[in-house]
Every structure is written in structure tokens, then in C-alpha cells.
Design a protein with these regions (language model features):
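Signature of long, low-cysteine stretches enriched in small and polar/charged residues
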Residues: 1-43, 47-55, 59-60
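Surface-exposed amphipathic alpha-helical segments
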Residues: 49-128
């Protein structure tokens, strides 16, 4: 899991999460899912972006920047073993949103950007 958040979607509180899964033969698929709960049902909107071409560039560049900043490999590996609420805590996080601006065509950046676009125009008609 990359992230999970409660967001406002057309005036309704909703759950938004992003999953990262391996794809064959290489690369990752990033899947964003918006779940809108209603009285007797729920609505799910899913958006998937796949990695194509050369993969791992975002991760390699972010890692290189952390190493260049003086963070040791040992610190990175030790921080990856610390968990808080089921999520690894540490310095190295190539999936963090702050890297999206540097990698706008990365599938994770696109999932987040498309999700913001959907939220900006989403409307719900009728009573559910």
C-alpha cells in the first residue's frame, strides 16, 4: 500500500487509497481507488497506471539524492525496518508525493494527478 486517506468527494467523505503491485514481466502497476459510501451501498472508482519502458528511474534518482545528502545505506536499511501503524517509516520514500513534481510522467504521479482532476469535477446527483 502506498497511501490511504479520507477525502471529501462531492461533499461526501470518501476513502482514497493507492496500491502498488508487480506487473509481468517488469515494472509496477499503481492502482488508485476512491470508495464513496452511501446509506445502503457504495460506489467505487478505480484508476490504474502502468509502468512501461525503463523502470525504477524514480526510485534510483531518489535513492541517489538521499545518499548524496549524507544518509548512509545502513541508516536507510535500519529505517526501513521501523513501522508505525503498519507503514514502514524512514528517510527513503520514492513514493512520497513530494517527488511527483520531479517525475510527472511516472505512473504514481499520474494516478495522483488524475485523481485530483476527478475530484475537482465529481458531482453526485440524487439521494443515496
Amino acid at each position: 500500500m502506498v497511501s490511504v486517506d479520507v477525502v471529501g468527494a462531492a461533499g461526501v467523505p470518501a476513502l482514497w487509497y493507492i496500491l502498488k503491485q508487480n506487473q509481468a514481466p517488469s515494472g509496477m502497476v499503481y492502482s488508485g481507488c476512491l470508495i464513496l459510501p452511501f446509506t445502503n451501498s457504495f460506489f467505487t472508482l478505480q484508476l490504474m497506471c502502468m509502468e512501461t519502458g525503463i523502470t525504477g528511474i524514480r526510485e534510483a534518482i531518489v535513492m541517489d539524492r538521499f545518499i548524496a545528502s549524507g544518509v548512509s545505506i545502513r541508516e536507510l536499511s535500519e529505517s526501513a525496518t521501523r513501522f508505525e501503524h503498519g507503514t514502514a517509516k524512514g528517510h527513503y520514500s520514492p513514493d512520497a508525493p513530494e517527488h511527483d513534481v520531479q517525475f510527472p510522467n511516472h505512473p504514481l504521479s499520474r494516478v495522483r494527478r488524475y485523481f485530483r482532476d476527478v475530484l475537482s469535477v465529481l458531482s453526485i446527483k440524487g439521494v443515496y
